[in-house]
């Protein structure tokens, strides 16, 4: 991931009085102001919401209001630093920024985290909470509470964060503020009187946000005199500095030249530079307890794998006196795809490009793969379908590489008769029914708990869709007279099969979806394969539930037939599950009349020409299958 701390797109509106920011604060003056602020006047907070509710826009307004950035055409979505984030209008990577705000004559040091809204990037949100004491719970006045609003609330509540409810987009004609306030009270037990009404687009109501943050969110707790206790919250790779760490200090101070040790790996480092994001990387002489900033080492940390998120750092020699911070749960890939270069001669260059992206996205798993049809490639694991799509876009934009991606699949688990377990990520490696040990084995597939919100009028259609996708209803709740929250347990395989797109179609775009892993369930799984003239095509293979075999098999052969040209010999396309052929399509050959010029009585010549044509078709068929 390229985190070169570059600015975002433009914003030309300024409908409120923000402090002048034309002249950038000199580094020495900035450090002096920060040094004069005690930890009691620190506030660390994040903005959480459903996707497209206005988190990044509100972040821009707060940065402008505090004078951290100027209200110019160059500063829209300034915390969205990836091209794909600006193009899609979504936040993929949680970004941080430090602000200084004068409230009632006193300076406050505010640390803001802009978090992703999409469920695929929930791990980014969870890590952000570790560096915060509170959160702005943002809700779109036109949409109301949606699936990821509910999920983010429960995550924040579990972390015991102080919540400040904020209603955004109040300037929109479709805004229904009383409905949103009622939803907040009924679903989250948040007092409507505490909600802040604003429009992040125009700036209306934005000046009320920071006083509420200062008054309602507690300051961090820490002691500068204690030994260093530093939590690793995030990391990224820089070509010149090596691995750069985003850290939160609980105790002590850290400065350039300090010798630190990782309690997780035992490796020792010398600090090369410390600083804050203001909003870009701004070096400082020291980071103190309660602050969030960046650190890199000299010589630099070379491997991103050495930066274990949730790790604790302290001074060399103080290891026995510091209790490690609770670590983070590493996100597990839920979607796997095989990736191949469009031209095998580009394999080495594409490998370098993929490795560079994986350096900065630790949630992507990578291992080499090979296909008889497509050649050498990789098997990539992603957190979800959007994560996969974003990775492909970044590969194209940042490295100019195109790649062939197979259909997304989910892993399956096998418990063999002897009790040993095996997780199969590549469907081609899933054992067939002819495998000697498969009869006594137990097969499992991953399930997710899906939370769906929608208007009441679409409830019947959504239930029908979930049941058709092998879902089991867990709860049904009306959190408003016209809004429903529906909870289903659904196989992860059905989720990646464009369930969200089907939900949008069934509800005319009004449904929202959030999900979380709910573990493995025993299931009747079979391997569905595509054969062309009895030869398996390994790139087209999937592990599916037995109830889906016939439908998918017919879809495969029908679709594959459309992409195969007619030949001089018969092409037979079959979908098989175990020993059973579930669907078949035949492409008839071109026919050349080799007997047209023969006399009717020339039987031997007739037989000879027919045999020659038959042999020729065999050679063509063999040549076709070897391509």
Swiss-Prot record:
Residues passing through the membrane, by range: none
Signal peptide coordinates: none
Subcellular location field: Mitochondrion inner membrane
Catalytic activity: GTP + H2O = GDP + phosphate + H(+)
Transit peptide: 1-16
Annotated PROSITE patterns: G_TR_1 (PS00301), G_TR_2 (PS51722)
EC number: 3.6.5.-
Binding site for GTP: 49-56, 114-118, 168-171
Gene3D superfamilies: 3.30.70.240, Elongation factor 4, C-terminal domain (3.30.70.2570), Elongation Factor G (Translational Gtpase), domain 3 (3.30.70.870), P-loop containing nucleotide triphosphate hydrolases (3.40.50.300), Translation factors (2.40.30.10)
Family matches, as InterPro entries: EF-4, EFG_III/V, EFG_V-like, EFTu-like_2, G_TR_CS, LepA_C_sf, LepA_CTD, LepA_IV
Role description: Promotes mitochondrial protein synthesis. May act as a fidelity factor of the translation reaction, by catalyzing a one-codon backward translocation of tRNAs on improperly translocated ribosomes. Binds to mitochondrial ribosomes in a GTP-dependent manner.
Protein family membership: Belongs to the TRAFAC class translation factor GTPase superfamily. Classic translation factor GTPase family. LepA subfamily.
Descriptive protein name: Translation factor GUF1, mitochondrial
Organism: Fusarium vanettenii (strain ATCC MYA-4622 / CBS 123669 / FGSC 9596 / NRRL 45880 / 77-13-4)
Lineage: Eukaryota, Fungi, Dikarya, Ascomycota, Pezizomycotina
Gene: GUF1
